Amino acid sequence: MAEITTIARPYAKAAFDFAIENNAVDSWAEMLNFAAMVSENETIKPLLAGGLASNKLAELFIGVCGEQVNEQGQNLLKVMAENGRLEVLPAVAQQFVELCNEWAKEIEATVVSAVELTSEQQQDISVSLEKRLARKVKLNCSIDASLVAGVIITAGDLVIDGSVRGKISRLSDTLQS
């Protein structure tokens, strides 16, 4: 079982990352669940076990899935077929769901800036943090004029100091050492 999970994880992670980037998590979850059901079908299962060339297997499998799987989903299925991994589709779908559940958790991020941030700047910061942390982010913004310019972002154990005050402090430390 651990071996199947190990094999499935990179495929699930790649699909999840792609789905996040394209804001298509729900459609990818549906596609993977459908493809997993197809792979467990009693007629299809023996074909996955061997004998068929990978390109023919991918073509057949994609044909069975039909419109339920979009072009990017078909590309994933082709790669999995080329590597003889279509049998682990149920585990890929399960791993994908686990990644979705983890991602659905929200993390609070504190953003301290020298001046008030516009809603567009807050949105940009939020999107960047969501990509980096692979979680939904709720921003708590505050103003500290002593930063001179820039921002300090704190999210969990991640601290990003992009303030002028921080840069001056690091420069001072470097010069004193």
Curated annotation (Swiss-Prot):
GO molecular function, one term: proton-transporting ATP synthase activity, rotational mechanism
Keyword line: ATP synthesis, Cell inner membrane, Cell membrane, CF(1), Hydrogen ion transport, Ion transport, Membrane, Transport
Key word Cytoplasm present: no
Pfam families in the record: OSCP
Domain of life: Bacteria
InterPro entries membership: ATP_synth_OSCP/delta_N_sf, ATPase_OSCP/dsu
Main location: membrane
Compartments (UniProt record): Cell inner membrane
Membrane topology according to the record: Peripheral membrane protein
One GO CC annotation: plasma membrane
NCBIfam families: ATP_synt_delta (TIGR01145), PRK05758.2-2 (NF004402), PRK05758.2-5 (NF004404)
Record note on quaternary structure: F-type ATPases have 2 components, F(1) - the catalytic core - and F(0) - the membrane proton channel. F(1) has five subunits: alpha(3), beta(3), gamma(1), delta(1), epsilon(1). F(0) has three main subunits: a(1), b(2) and c(10-14). The alpha and beta chains form an alternating ring which encloses part of the gamma chain. F(1) is attached to F(0) by a central stalk formed by the gamma and epsilon chains, while a peripheral stalk is formed by the delta and b chains.
Task performed by this protein: F(1)F(0) ATP synthase produces ATP from ADP in the presence of a proton or sodium gradient. F-type ATPases consist of two structural domains, F(1) containing the extramembraneous catalytic core and F(0) containing the membrane proton channel, linked together by a central stalk and a peripheral stalk. During catalysis, ATP synthesis in the catalytic domain of F(1) is coupled via a rotary mechanism of the central stalk subunits to proton translocation. This protein is part of the stalk that links CF(0) to CF(1). It either transmits conformational changes from CF(0) to CF(1) or is implicated in proton conduction.
Membership in a protein family: Belongs to the ATPase delta chain family.
PANTHER family assigned: ATP SYNTHASE DELTA CHAIN
Protein name in UniProt: ATP synthase subunit delta
Species whose genome carries this gene: Shewanella sediminis (strain HAW-EB3)
